[in-house]
Regions:
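A generic local secondary-structure boundary/capping motif
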Residues: 40-49, 54, 63-70, 96-100, ...
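Catalytic-pocket segment enriched in acidic/His residues
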Residues: 87-205
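Structural signature of FAD isoalloxazine-binding scaffolds in flavoprotein oxidoreductases
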Residues: 25-33, 51, 185, 189-195
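Short, structured patches in soluble enzyme cores that scaffold and shape functional sites
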Residues: 43, 51-55, 59-61, 79-84, ...
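Short helix/loop capping segments that flank catalytic or ligand/cofactor-binding pockets
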Residues: 35, 66-68, 88-90
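Generic beta-strand structural signal
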Residues: 28, 35-37, 47-55, 76-77
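RNA pseudouridine synthases
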Residues: 66-81
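N-terminal low-complexity segments that are often proline-rich with Ser/Thr-Pro
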Residues: 1-29
Length: 205
């Protein structure tokens, strides 16, 4: 409904990312952390470490020139993701690639639930916690990026191979948007969960 949509807009306003079109980003993720594995915060040079709970979409077929109405046929399943972000690195380089692609900056799990378990797009409660404190709380179909649009847009002229993982935006409540900002520190534990899929918890080292 309206409240959830406003929450998403608030998040983007909080981090001052104005845009006329959706920004699409490719990240260099060599491997995803699983539940319980430690996130290396790279705190020797990262001072603004943040979390983002997101719905992960896993493609089951190569996708090229896919129409929005056909996207559901290309989705293998869904999982829970934490798109870890170094905000100071993002702004230092005036782009998102490096600040979201450092080693261990992507966690996913605990399972991939097959797409036939949900409608497309799924409407599932999505939350994050830091040390047990609720930080983000929304519904997956109210995230900023529309799943059908993401897959269709990216597949125009560029093949998305089977196994590609797409993440779809994060609700309000990230550390940078708090007043004052509240970034992660060594020893913190971030928990991300989506109803119907599961939860992952990862400590910061």
């Amino acid at each position: 409904g309206t409240a959830g949509s406003l929450d998403e807009l608030v998040h983007w306003a909080q981090i001052q990312l104005a845009r006329s079109r959706q920004a699409l980003r490719l990240a260099d993720v060599l491997r995803a952390l699983g539940d319980g594995e430690a996130i290396d915060g790279h705190l020797d040079f990262v001072s603004k470490l943040d979390y983002e709970v997101e719905l992960a979409v896993v493609l089951g077929r190569d996708a090229l020139h896919v129409r929005e109405e056909d996207v559901g046929d290309y989705i293998f399943g869904y999982s829970v993701a934490n798109d870890v972000s170094a905000r100071d690195v993002q702004y230092r380089h005036k782009q998102n690639f490096l600040g979201k692609s450092l080693d261990t900056f992507f966690a996913m799990g605990p399972v991939i639930v097959t797409a036939d378990e949900f409608p497309c797009p799924p409407a599932l409660s999505i939350r994050s916690f830091v040390n047990g404190e609720l930080r983000q709380n929304s519904v997956t179909d109210q995230v900023f990026f529309n799943i059908r649009h993401i897959v269709s847009e990216l597949s125009q002229g560029m093949t998305l191979p089977a196994g590609t993982i797409l993440i779809t935006g994060t609700p309000a409540g990230v550390g940078m948007g708090m007043d004052p900002p509240c970034f992660l520190k060594r020893g913190d534990v971030v928990t991300c969960e989506i109803d119907g899929i599961g939860r992952i918890s990862n400590p910061i080292r």
